[in-house]
Amino acid sequence: MHLNRVLRETGVVVAAGLLYGSAAFAQSSTIIGTVIDAQSRQPAADVVVTATSPNLQGEQTVVTDAQGNYRIPQLPPGDYTLRFEKEQFKPYARSAIQLRLNRTIRVNVELLPEALGEVVEIVGAPPTIDVGSTTMGVNVDQEFIKRIAVARPGGKGGATRSFESLAELAPGAQNDNYGVSINGSTSPENGYVVDGLSTNDPAFGVNASPLSIEFVQDVNIITGGYMPEFGRSTGGVINAVTRSGSNEFHGSVFANWTPGTLEGTRKQIREEGTVITGQNQLQNLGDFGATLGGPILKDKLWFFAGFAPSFTRYQHTRTLNALRVDDEGNTIKDETDFTVADAIPGSARKYYADSRTIQYMGKLTYLINQDHNVSFALNGTPTSTGGLGKLSVNPQSGGLPGVLATRPGDFGLTETKANTTSLALKYAGAFADKKVLVDANLGWFHQTASTLPGDGSNLGDRTGLAGYSRMVYTTPRALTLFEALPEGQEGACGSTPEEQLVRSPVTGYGVGGPGFMSDQTLDRYQANAKATYLLNALGTHVFKAGVDVELLSFDQVKAYGGGVFFQEGSNYGVAGQGPAVHDARRYGYQTGPDSAVTQFTQVAKTTSTTVGGFLQDSWSIANRVTLNLGVRYDVQALYGGNGDLSLLLGNQWSPRIGAIVDPFANGRAKVFVNFARYYEQVPLNLMDRAFPGENRISARRSLAEPGQGTATSCDPSSFESQQATCNTDSNLLAIPESSRNVNRFYTGGTVGGTPVDPDIKAQSSDEIVVGAEYEVLANTRLGASYTHKDMNSVIEDMSRDDGNTYFLGNPGSGFAGEFPTPVRNYDNVTVYLNRTFADGWLAQANYTWSRLYGNYPGLFRPETGQLDPNILSDFDLIELLENRTGLLPFDRTHQIKVFGAKEFNISNALSASVGVSYRGSSGTPINYWGSHWAYLQDESFVLPRGAGGRTPWINTIDSNIGVNYRVSKDSVVSFTLDVFNLFNFQGVNTVDQTYTLRDIKPIPGGTPADLENLPGRVEFQDQAPRDEPFGSVDGDVNKNFKNPLSYQAPRQVRFGIRYTF
């Protein structure tokens, strides 16, 4: 280290700078360091070290020990000033120390004797390497947020600018259906923490609180390598701490607006097999609100409050088309091999999808004395979308309406509401001169979620929308069979039924009521406490131990409109029985053979109790080696709808072992390795569906074409026929004797719980992380890491008798030994360069190579969007197990993320900043999906995973421009302009992977060549035989297969204005 002696009046030097230490996802941070005599180079004992910050009530004071070491724990993140004082030394104050969330930073100091007239000054910037931790991830604060375009409009939490959206900034992270996938896991596997308490949905595991980044001070995205203090997550952790008051009144008034008029052109989605097109266009999206914080009693009692409504409106244009034909009546293809279609004049109809959220929060922080404080926080996020005649924005995924292949008047039938309320009480205390620390949290996270009929009818009613069943026709039919064409265009699709089928085919067309509906109430009661003890013995030990308890409950009423969801299906291959309609989903039971009873609602309240504890030690040796050692134990008891204990998951021992070496002992480099085992906390949806099991019955009925119902044939397009013929036994089709049990017409209906393997093991994954970092320039570090993750035991339901009965176990072991072992192997190599914001600019860049391979995607099925943790369809049926091993849906071989920003000071009052970001990623695997006679669409892998190649690369460039004008000393007006997808790239996000809607068998180990020269190469499933070979009937192969289903979100421009005081 280069030293330069200069004469000076002050008498101190900061020697080792800021050395980032242990990171975890608690809600406070720590400053540590060593103080020495600059002349004698000996430790300086009994030096008084005082920390102050605008975010800290009062001040925190400690005294150095005999070795000159000090530790100031339980600090909120913020900018700090440290004062060092002792009689024989000149006093010193070091300011502008940035302490981020969940960090331990080191500030080493050399004090000069009072009599010495010169000071030893260090030339160069302090190191920025985190030498005490193996934790991987990124920390996002308000400094980054205001300079880089983040929280893209649209998507989940888009209008609210949810803290969860920041997770995709981390290397190895990507957006998935319900949030952000981290290192190959699915979003419900992540832990979501706000102010020390979980915001995970107790039933499904996803983040349930889209809390605005306006209310958040820091967000820490942990991708792996964390200590045993934290568990119940097999993915990453998104940890946020909300803002607090201070000794000065401060606040903001803000507004953000994304107008649809400036949106880039959306590429039209063209679908084969249907003449209905749909286009979503943003109308308005934004949020506005205010925050205020300050003292009620200075240095004693602070408050912070915020209020932020947000709104979203999309316009969906539904258009009817007619296929163009030649002189011989054959359809015409264009140069891209799409069938040429002409829009029918006057057919375009506009519908609106609205979403509204009101967010609020309040927080009180009380300082009992210097060593003890408590805080209480309240926040809520009520959201509503849809309504009668309106479309919905899915609150769980942010998904927009797809093509409305549904009869006009039969969509826009429900209103969806999602409301969360969180209460959190936190205590932090220090004893024995801050050698013993105690932290405790107590909280309640309450949710209501419902999708109910828009006309006000109640679930289970036989009248109104609640009594109206949904029907889907899977075989191509003429549009004119369901809808009247605009006046004057009656002949646009032809004049005969045959011509109309050629020129206006629709596939997967829906009629009827709202389908599945539910009304849910969920609660998560949480309590945890931990104690930390600092010991100097053969180095420095930070021992920590703790316990925590979580009580979950899930109360749900669920129903299908009219008591049943109909879908066109096979007639069992019996000649003369004609077309069939399948009771695809009907709740009910049987009191005897063929004595079915329909349940118009199913009601269940399920609960869970989880108790855990941990012990860990972070042992630092000679400022060169740190060993992080610990173990965690959890046990979860789950209770079914009858109140009985249904599943007990113990023996959840989670070892965590890490080592960090600082080879030069100067904080400018590190090499590290870590092993960890993580266990899942099973969400309650499993209990709701399986304990006792869902009572479902199924049958097939004689299907009448729309408008042609009779006393013995069901016309589900008619409400009257649904209420009469479709719910009687007069139109039932007999099950072939070869597959018949005691029932001639019905399957299912068995009442009872799901058997559980007595040796079932909790679900877990293992992780190994190896990496190195080196500070190549001041504030700039270069790093590389390798991560491997794989699954141990997985909990899933399975069936040996074609779905008549199910049991719960670990596929591949125990009672389920003949089922394939779940595999999800993830390998990741990341190279990154990070420059923290300094000297007016920041830069971050990372490249990730990864591979995700196996037969188990996670806690939801990306293929169908099925969100049923631990009870997915992947291992249900033996006949569907073929071809499921391969590259998994979120396998992206390459990912590149680059962020940069520069700030310009134009005058004392005026400044500006420019930020640019680039994200690029390779495509995802394409599959060949088929249908299943009982599980319906996209449940069968006709060919092995990934046999269809990959989707294209996706490239996105975003920009940020900010202008700040200082009105007075403490008030600033800011204007921001965020442009997302600056060049309006329209890369293909997803393609249609439905090869067929027919119930065909997988081809084990097959290739695309096996599907050439149809018919005759593919077999139908045994329960859905057909006389005509597959490929001989129009509609057997999906005409839209591999065509784009979605493109990148277009260019969107967000304006922001803010007054801060």
From Swiss-Prot:
InterPro entries assigned to the protein according to its UniProt record, in alphabetical order: Carb-bd-like_fold, Plug_dom_sf, TonB-dep_rcpt-like, TonB_rcpt_b-brl_sf
Signal peptide annotation: 1-26
Ranges of compositional bias, category Polar residues: 709-722
Phenotype when the gene is knocked out: The deletion mutant is impaired in PopC secretion and does not accumulate the intercellular C-signal protein (p17). Disruption of the gene results in a severe defect in the development of fruiting bodies. The deletion mutant has a growth rate similar to the wild type and displays normal type IV pili-dependent motility and gliding motility.
Protein origin, superkingdom: Bacteria
Membrane topology field: Multi-pass membrane protein
Protein name from the UniProt record: TonB-dependent transporter Oar
Species in which this protein is naturally found: Myxococcus xanthus
Gene for this chain: oar
